[in-house]
Each structure stands twice: as C-alpha cells, then as structure tokens.
C-alpha cells in the first residue's frame, strides 16, 4: 500500500512559535512599567485613555494605595494588562508626552524670536510681521528699544518678557 502524505496525529499542523521565559518576563515587566506610568497620571488625563473597566479601576485603586499595597497592585495591573492590547494605551501615552515636548520646542522658538527682536531690531520685527500680520509693529519696536536700554543699565528684563508674552499670544491666536 502506498502511504499518503498525512501528518501523524502528534505532529502539530501549525508552526509553534517558541518564546523564552526570559523574553516573557521582559514583556511582563514592560507592561508593568506602562501600568506604573498610568498610575502616575492625573485622573483627568486617564479618562482620555482607552482602558477597560478592570484596568481603570485597578489604576484608581493603585493611586490610593501606599508602599507594599501599591507594589502588589502594580503587579496586578501588569497581570490585567496582559489580557489587554497595550498598543492603543502606549500610543495615547506617547501622544501626551510628545504634546509636552512639542510645546517646549514651540516656547524655545518664541524665545529665540524674542532674542532676535531685541538684538536685531527692525529686521527681526519685519520677520515677525510676516509671520503674524496682526502684530503691533510700533509696540514691538518700542519694547525692543526699552529692552536694549534695560540690558545696558543692568535692569531686570521686563520689556523682554513683555515681548515674549506678545509673541506667545500671537502664536496662540493662530
């Protein structure tokens, strides 16, 4: 009799992906650390996250607990997170982090623009007028002159701060 190409009943039909115990522990630790970051967030921010009811309640409980109870609760959060897809949660957390870093970058750009207005005067003010046509050219010139006088007299940089506030308001108005 000819033997057909049949698999023996003990041979699996699909390929099994083998994962080491160390890799599994590393993944679990990563989920627990993600849970810790969620516990550190304010409740108003947490409401915006795509969390299951169990996970949301576990996080709220962990925020109340202290010391050893909190450590155990964090382990429980890690366990609950194994049954949840962590990618949407991680994406929302990254979005919040990037929002803060992006705001910091914008403020640094405004500070550099303010420094240019004080140092270069009319040339930098013209650039500001191109970016923000609703800006008050006369007020910016006046503040730039005052800032230079304050700098020469070693006085506090009140006018520079005011220029920064004007630029910030113009930026927020966009």
UniProtKB/Swiss-Prot annotation:
Keywords: Cytoplasm, Ribosome biogenesis, RNA-binding, rRNA-binding. GO terms for molecular function: ribosome binding; rRNA binding. SUPFAM superfamilies: PSPTO4464-like (SSF158710). Gene3D superfamilies: PSPTO4464-like domains. It is found in: Cytoplasm. CDD domains: YjgA-like. Pfam families: DarP. GO terms for biological process: assembly of large subunit precursor of preribosome. PANTHER family: UPF0307 PROTEIN YJGA (PTHR38101:SF1). Belongs to the DarP family. Member of a network of 50S ribosomal subunit biogenesis factors which assembles along the 30S-50S interface, preventing incorrect 23S rRNA structures from forming. Promotes peptidyl transferase center (PTC) maturation. NCBIfam families: PRK05255.1-1. This is Dual-action ribosomal maturation protein DarP. It comes from Vibrio atlanticus (strain LGP32).
């Amino acid at each position: 009799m000819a033997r057909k190409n049949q698999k023996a009943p003990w041979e699996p039909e699909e390929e099994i992906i083998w994962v080491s115990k160390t890799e599994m522990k590393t993944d679990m630790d990563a989920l627990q650390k993600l849970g810790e970051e969620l516990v550190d967030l304010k409740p108003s921010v947490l409401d915006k996250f795509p969390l299951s009811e169990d996970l949301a309640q576990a996080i709220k409980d962990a925020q109340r607990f202290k010391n050893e109870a909190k450590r155990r609760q964090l382990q429980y959060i890690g366990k609950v997170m194994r049954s949840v897809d962590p990618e949407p949660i991680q994406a929302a957390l990254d979005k919040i982090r990037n929002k803060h870093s992006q705001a910091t970058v914008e403020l640094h750009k405004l500070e550099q623009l303010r420094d240019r207005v004080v140092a270069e005067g009319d040339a930098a003010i013209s650039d500001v007028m191109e970016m923000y046509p609703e800006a008050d050219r006369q007020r910016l010139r006046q503040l730039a002159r005052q800032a230079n006088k304050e700098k020469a007299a070693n006085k506090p940089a009140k006018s520079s701060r005011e220029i920064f506030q004007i630029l910030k308001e113009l930026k927020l108005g966009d």
